[in-house]
A protein has these predicted regions:
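Helical-face signature of the major facilitator-like transporter fold
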Residues: 15-19, 23, 56, 90, ...
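Symmetry-related core transmembrane helices of the 12-TM Major Facilitator Superfamily/SLC fold
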Residues: 171-190
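Cytoplasmic helix-loop-helix junction between adjacent transmembrane helices
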Residues: 105-143
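Conserved MFS/SLC helix-loop-helix module at the cytosolic interface between two early adjacent transmembrane helices
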Residues: 61-100
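Extracellular/periplasmic helix-loop-helix junction of adjacent transmembrane segments
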Residues: 30-61
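Glycine-rich segments within core transmembrane alpha-helices of 12-TM secondary carriers
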Residues: 135-160, 180-181
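Cytosolic juxtamembrane N-terminal segment immediately preceding the first transmembrane helix
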Residues: 1-29
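Membrane-interface helix termini in secondary transporters
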Residues: 35, 67-68, 158
Length: 208
């Protein structure tokens, strides 16, 4: 039981937080669209819909290749890298001024997030949990999506009416929700370990 609690703290909890941040950065475009048209006259409903969909083109194209790359390197470091990357993309979205830039940033965001859940499901969770334990670990981690939906709307509403270092509306939303991804990428790299034999908090008996 003690080992299970420690795995919840050191494995499931950091993955839970990563999943929340990923989901918020993925869907905040829906809320940002409420004010983006004020500054971007070219953002017609057709352009907005295309940009929202282009995210999934990047996601689908790179989901398998990126996951294969992650399997060949340290999966924990890979998650930290892609998290840092999608945070930067979200920050860069505050600078977009053209339709093409909108499409490019949405594609890059999909590319960066593409391998997150495959790496979690196929590498990190299996490294830490026996087959009979994985369903519980994954279900607990996936409650992050429900939690994200609960906080996402109210948080977006607040940020859209907030000025942050001279930025207002949708730009505030993008940058404030991107900062946690950039910062937590470094925290995750030290907090999470790829497998039990890499973790100092796992005893020799538990590693066996």
């Amino acid at each position: 039981k003690d080992f299970t609690k420690r795995r919840m703290l050191h494995v499931v909890l950091p993955l839970f937080i990563v999943s929340i941040i990923a989901f918020l950065d993925r869907v905040n475009i829906a809320y940002a669209g409420l004010t983006m048209k004020e500054n971007l006259p070219w953002l017609t409903p057709e352009v907005f819909g295309m940009g929202a969909g282009i995210f999934f083109i990047g996601y689908v194209l790179f989901e398998v290749p990126a996951s294969l790359i992650a399997a060949r390197c340290n999966a924990m470091h890979w998650v930290a890298r892609i998290m840092f990357s999608w945070g930067l993309v979200c920050i860069l979205m505050t600078t977009m001024t053209t339709e093409l830039e909108f499409y490019i940033y949405r594609f890059l965001l999909g590319l960066c997030e593409a391998s997150l859940y495959p790496v979690i499901y196929s590498l990190l969770i299996p490294n830490w949990f026996l087959p009979k334990e994985r369903a519980k670990a994954i279900s607990l981690m996936l409650t992050s999506l429900l939690f994200s939906n609960i906080i996402g709307g109210p948080l977006a509403g607040i940020l859209l009416d907030t000025t942050f270092f001279g930025l207002h509306g949708w730009r505030t939303l993008f940058i404030v929700e991107a900062i946690p991804a950039v910062i937590f990428a470094f925290i995750f790299a030290f907090w999470m370990k790829e497998r039990p034999d890499h973790a100092s908090w796992v005893t020799d008996a538990e590693k066996a």
